[in-house]
Regions:
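Active-site proximal loop and beta-alpha junction motif in alpha/beta enzyme cores
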Residues: 1-81, 90-123
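Conserved acetyl-CoA-binding loop-helix of GNAT-fold acetyltransferases
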Residues: 86-88
Length: 124
């Protein structure tokens, strides 16, 4: 079982938190376009649970091979793409048994292919 953080901010809850070189908080939702990331991103990034702040990913599972992700980068705001964010989203989705290890992550700036190897390495 993957530990989810007991955190709720408006319509977002139970994120998976990972560190893939920097901290990420990943929320799974039915439809990424319905989440007001411009408003919720800074609330999550600066939440007291994250003393070093956190990156935020809003993730929609399209299939076992595809995710759609929106990104709020700590210190930068909404960005069109984030490599470590795509890796964090892919790892979280696989840990929750929602996707395979080798998937495509669609971001506003384009699609990244992510492969999480059995040895723990993540290839982008």
């Amino acid at each position: 079982m993957v530990p989810k953080l007991d955190l709720s901010i408006e319509m977002l809850s139970d994120p998976v938190c990972l560190n893939v070189g920097n901290p990420h908080t990943v929320f799974f939702v039915a439809e990424v376009t319905k989440i007001p990331l411009e408003r919720l991103g800074p609330l999550i990034e600066n939440h007291q649970m994250f003393p070093e702040k956190t990156n935020v990913e809003i993730v929609q599972v399209e299939s076992t091979k595809n995710l759609t992700v929106r990104v709020w980068e700590r210190g930068a705001g909404i960005t069109k793409a984030c490599g470590t964010g795509a890796c964090a989203a892919a790892a979280a989705a696989h840990l929750l048994e929602l996707t395979d290890r080798n998937i495509d992550v669609k971001l506003d700036g384009g699609t990244l292919s992510i492969n999480w190897l059995e040895n723990g390495d993540i290839i982008m």
